[in-house]
Amino acid sequence: LLGLPNAGKSSLLSAITNAKPKIGNYPYTTLTPQLGIIRNYNQEIVLADIPGLINDAHKGVGIGTRFLGHIERCKILLHLIDAKSPNPLKNYKNIIKEITKYGKGLEKKKQVLIISKADLVSNEELKVIVKNIEEYSKSSVLVSSSINKIGLNELIDVLFTKLEKLDNENNNKETKEKKWSP
């Protein structure tokens, strides 16, 4: 789970997993990565909630490089964008800038974009936010509210589907790379 401080990452982790992270309405409630597990039939996904990233996190500000290092091992980035923030598109761009400047391929990882706290804005505001981020990112955007349980099942379905597809692609790539020799 990736985003600015107070974007709703811990609330989402708590809403869709068995984790009970500390949740507060102030930045830096999460100080260390928190883990939770989503189970779906015979599959499970481990979600990692990392502390919020701030400007210049890639330089180590707010011990950002330590947090970014944790997501190097993640297969997919769940990018939360707070609907209630003054400029959600700018917030999205800031996080993309930080993971790009950090390097190590983070910007190339698959992402699921989620507008969080959707219950706190009007439908009209939400449509504008979604449109702006979809146009900029060239990706579809999910809408959620952890408190009101909006969009959570869809998010879980998308996450399992994307991970299965990614695992299949990686398995096919590994099979092609292995050469048989008697």
Predicted region positions:
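Conserved G1/Walker A P-loop phosphate-binding module
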Residues: 1-61, 65-76, 81, 156-157
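C-terminal-of-GTPase-core extension/linker across diverse P-loop GTPases
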Residues: 1-2, 7, 86-93, 97-182
